[in-house]
Design a protein with these regions (language model features):
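Glycine-rich phosphate-binding loops of nucleotide-dependent enzymes
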Residues: 2-236
Length: 236
């Protein structure tokens, strides 16, 4: 049984339909990448899975149970955490306080302690008491990833975590992914950068205009396959 899957998932913003029958599957210990141009529906898919965009059709299944009608806090307690696009840190809080914000009032057990986050991103320990907004964009993204991990999720959703960052910073962030995977977390990465997605993913889904246009292992997909699917010229 897959750890998480969507079945014929649709999503709307008012009368506008953003997703059309999307089927994806994430197995335990796996990293999958969702690629596509702006407006393809990638972020809407992540918002549907995380519970931010509530889905009354119960088309999102986590460990075999529907989560579509749950609030995002309940989804997080069930074991899904999201690193949202744009980082969205609390500007009045320190780096350490931002990392711990999701643990207040909860007993969280697992690999990802504050010390483990500092081991993953040592710069965050150096700047633990600094205001989060005093950090560079890449460092703020590390805080956002650490904040999601510290809840010890079974599934980590990463939405456009490389957006607006320099290539060297993106490389540093993705260098942490083998350790994240080794901790037992399964990961869904949303990326516009096709090359980066192919490096990190066990399987790739390409989206265009709210639909999945291609899926498969990176080793099984040709550059032409991916480019055609990215621009919506084929459906598989």
């Amino acid at each position: 049984m897959s750890l998480l899957r969507t079945h014929n998932l649709t999503a709307y913003y008012g009368d506008f339909q953003a997703l059309f029958g999307v089927d994806i599957e994430l197995n335990a210990g796996e990293t999958i990448a969702i690629i596509g141009a702006n407006g393809a529906g990638k972020t809407t898919l992540m918002r549907s899975i995380s519970g931010v965009l509530r889905n009354a059709s119960n088309s999102v299944l986590f460990e075999g149970s529907a989560i579509g009608a749950k609030e995002s806090d309940a989804v997080m307690r069930d074991g899904i955490a999201m690193v949202p696009e744009g980082r969205k840190l609390f500007p009045s809080l320190s780096v350490k306080e931002n990392l711990l914000i999701g643990t207040y009032g909860r007993k969280v057990k697992g690999y990802w302690t504050l010390e483990a986050i500092y081991d993953l991103f040592p710069i965050l320990q150096e700047k633990a008491d600094a205001p989060a907004t005093s950090l560079s964009g890449g460092q703020q993204q590390m805080v956002a990833i650490g904040r999601a991990l510290i809840s010890n999720p079974k599934v980590l959703l990463c939405d456009e975590i490389s957006l607006g960052l320099a290539p060297v910073v993106i490389k540093d962030i993705y260098a942490a992914f083998p350790k994240i995977k080794a901790s037992g977390a399964s990961v869904i990465v949303v990326e516009q950068d096709i090359a980066q997605a192919l490096k990190v993913a066990d399987r790739v889904y390409c989206m265009m205009e709210g639909r999945v246009t291609l899926s498969g292992k990176p080793s099984d997909l040709t550059r032409d396959d991916i480019q055609d699917a990215y621009f919506g010229r084929i459906t598989k």
